[in-house]
Amino acid sequence: LVNNAGYGHLGLFEQTSDADARAQFETNVFGMMDVTRAVLPVMRARRSGRVLNLSSVAGMAGFAMAGLYCASKFAVEGFSLSLAQEVKAFGIHVTVVAPGFIRTDFLDPSSYRLPDASIPDYAAMDEALRAAYLPMNHLQPGDPARLGRALVELAASESPPLRWSAGSDAVQMVDARLAELKAELDAGRALSASVDGEWA
């Protein structure tokens, strides 16, 4: 099973609505869950199966103007990592596939939703982010055909990874995020330990 349905709702969070958020999750999260729920009994009966859930680098790092999309992909990651533990005993492998920028129509106006700026305080940021994101359309470094071949290889693997980053740009972004997390973890170790109770 390859869960690949999704779209990006772009826009600064304060300029999005509750309906926008629910629509984003309906496609990117709940649709994926519904299909997975329907397929799992068949895989469980066969004691084998592969589930590849398409996330994104946006499922590990937040990006301004993509809060709803990032939130939906964080949900895909959390769901997938949890599901993997539940179904492993039945020979079912779950892999989170996290592509970087792949040369698709994702940044084409037909594929995303991007409301006009409505709050003057955000106007400059909105303009700058549009100028950064939108010109990348059809100039993304990742090759969708090569991604497809890699997914076939993952599906055929005897021991597929729990999480796989697709594209060197994805690997670089994950490396950067891991370094940030490690630095924050180290800086806050003493405060973190201060929460431990002295129960003995």
Task: Annotate each predicted stretch with a short phrase.
Residues 14, 61-68:
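Active-site loop immediately N-terminal to the catalytic Tyr-X3-Lys motif
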Residues 56:
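Residue(s) in the substrate-gating loop at a strand-loop-helix junction
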Residues 12-13, 20-22:
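Substrate-binding pocket helix/loop in short-chain dehydrogenase/reductase
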Residues 36, 72:
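Active-site helix of classical SDR
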Residues 61, 82-92:
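Active-site-adjacent segment of SDR/Rossmann-fold oxidoreductases
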Residues 89-160:
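SDR active-site lid
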Residues 4-9:
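Conserved NAD(P)H cofactor-binding loop of Rossmann-fold oxidoreductase domains
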